[in-house]
From Swiss-Prot:
Its EC number is 2.7.11.10. Autophosphorylated and phosphorylated by IKBKB/IKKB. Phosphorylation at Ser-172 is enhanced by the interaction with DDX3X. Phosphorylated at Thr-501 upon IFN activation. Sumoylation by TOPORS upon DNA damage is required for protection of cells against DNA damage-induced cell death. Desumoylated by SENP1. Induction: Induced by lipopolysaccharide (LPS) and TNFA. It comes from Homo sapiens (Human). The modification Phosphothreonine is found at residue 501. It comes from the Eukaryota. There is a cross-link at residues 30, 401 (Glycyl lysine isopeptide (Lys-Gly) (interchain with G-Cter in ubiquitin)). This is Inhibitor of nuclear factor kappa-B kinase subunit epsilon. Changing residue 38 to A: Loss of kinase activity and loss of nuclear import.
Amino acid sequence: MQSTANYLWHTDDLLGQGATASVYKARNKKSGELVAVKVFNTTSYLRPREVQVREFEVLRKLNHQNIVKLFAVEETGGSRQKVLVMEYCSSGSLLSVLESPENAFGLPEDEFLVVLRCVVAGMNHLRENGIVHRDIKPGNIMRLVGEEGQSIYKLTDFGAARELDDDEKFVSVYGTEEYLHPDMYERAVLRKPQQKAFGVTVDLWSIGVTLYHAATGSLPFIPFGGPRRNKEIMYRITTEKPAGAIAGAQRRENGPLEWSYTLPITCQLSLGLQSQLVPILANILEVEQAKCWGFDQFFAETSDILQRVVVHVFSLSQAVLHHIYIHAHNTIAIFQEAVHKQTSVAPRHQEYLFEGHLCVLEPSVSAQHIAHTTASSPLTLFSTAIPKGLAFRDPALDVPKFVPKVDLQADYNTAKGVLGAGYQALRLARALLDGQELMFRGLHWVMEVLQATCRRTLEVARTSLLYLSSSLGTERFSSVAGTPEIQELKAAAELRSRLRTLAEVLSRCSQNITETQESLSSLNRELVKSRDQVHEDRSIQQIQCCLDKMNFIYKQFKKSRMRPGLGYNEEQIHKLDKVNFSHLAKRLLQVFQEECVQKYQASLVTHGKRMRVVHETRNHLRLVGCSVAACNTEAQGVQESLSKLLEELSHQLLQDRAKGAQASPPPIAPYPSPTRKDLLLHMQELCEGMKLLASDLLDNNRIIERLNRVPAPPDV
């Protein structure tokens, strides 16, 4: 045990160790509160006095939630070594998070954004206080879990930090070589003499490498054999990097340098976030200081990302989930353009559903009016795009092979790589199942909308047909129309014949809609059956079971690698563990390929066929709806003409009757008196009936107009 006046710790509770100090987990003697103590060794006292006290002075100036707090500076009892008492971060460092096999291909998007927010806030506080850190790397970013379960990242280890204004330079070299600015790397690692001075932007390069590492799980610049074994090529990669490139690698010995301008496909970040992040990385991983961004622009651009909101959009036709990053104050038009950029679906062709309901977005309205979405509850984009599906790299391509002999360190590294690929397979399997669920749900919603359209259009058609049938079936009209001597009645008979034709068209439309309803119901039953099969899928559980067993063996390898060697029996167990581990990995990848990928690809093909049927059905319903509307419009016109004709005929008969009553002696009537009287009565009743029918047809037309206001998709 060691102690100071107020704190004590056991030397076994080592948290980290460097060239000049060791960090231990300690406790407050009075309260029992856990803290971290940094105990400086004898080597640290060989440094100049100014350098020794610099870390204390820097930490005393800082007070921010994203920087590890300094509680006290004390001394050990016997040797009187200086001790920094600091905030204890119980969840390790960002490096330990990235070293976990679950994060072998980088952090999930939400966690990466937390890292970005914390690092930017912490660096901004340093800059406000005129301090350059000079050793930014994942190992110097500590993690703490907050009360609500969220991660909080804090900058630590200010042993290399010093006060420096924007226009000042320094010449001393600090830092960890993989994260060093190329100019500092040349001097510190390659030991090449140079007269260059360094400014505050050296931290930007280190931040760029750190962010790339957090996003992908690997370093951006990798020479053949690794950065520590091939230092000259490492320097070449960083200094010869073309503008816009964010990574470089040498795949084989003496091979060419290959450049990357995008993040790898294995990265967990969405394309929406990648499109915002890549330009930042390209401009801070810039060796020429004249071209490299300054802190002001870096803070402005990263703050722009962090201030954006995410709208989750599932392109139903493409079967792809998109993350659209926009500002809350942006208009819907800007949102639609962002969707267009990722999906290639033009704004005028974008239709949205949310939780089963049509979601009409007005371009001029603020994006704040968009419903809150999540990855499992996104806006569903309906368009005529061709299915693409989730793009991914087969995890089997990233599975390393065990060496035949027993090599504890090599076996551990291999197991770690295989386990990382296994976790990637698990993530992809979940994404494939989630994608199928979103396909089924979106298709079900679209078919529900089409069924509702069928019901409304059918109601309009049947109502119009009922009115027409009622009018055409009246005996009074038949008796009146049977009087051929009156020319107007011949015209009325022709109009009546046209109404009969329209009634036949409406009848066919009604039958057509009924058949469409049956077709949609059949497709929906098929969809429910497919959805149930996906819900019964147990591939995720099988993969997880393999991973749990592999994890147990991996932990055994992790313990063994620290030992100098194994006894005979232990070595035999180790060999069996390697065999079992390989079998489990093979089984895991087999389940992924046969139960996940193949079923997903088959589902994608079926989805494409169903989408074509849905688009054809929708276009067909539009045509039927137009036919019903046209019939209603024409029937309304015919009814109005018929009503006007009968009204004129009724008026003429009234005039003839009045003239006949005044004449003496009464002339011989062209028609028998009873017929004239009945005819007049029938005309008046028919006029009223025609007016009512025309009014009903007008109401139907208004209903159809409202139906047609729903935006229509482009023609297939």
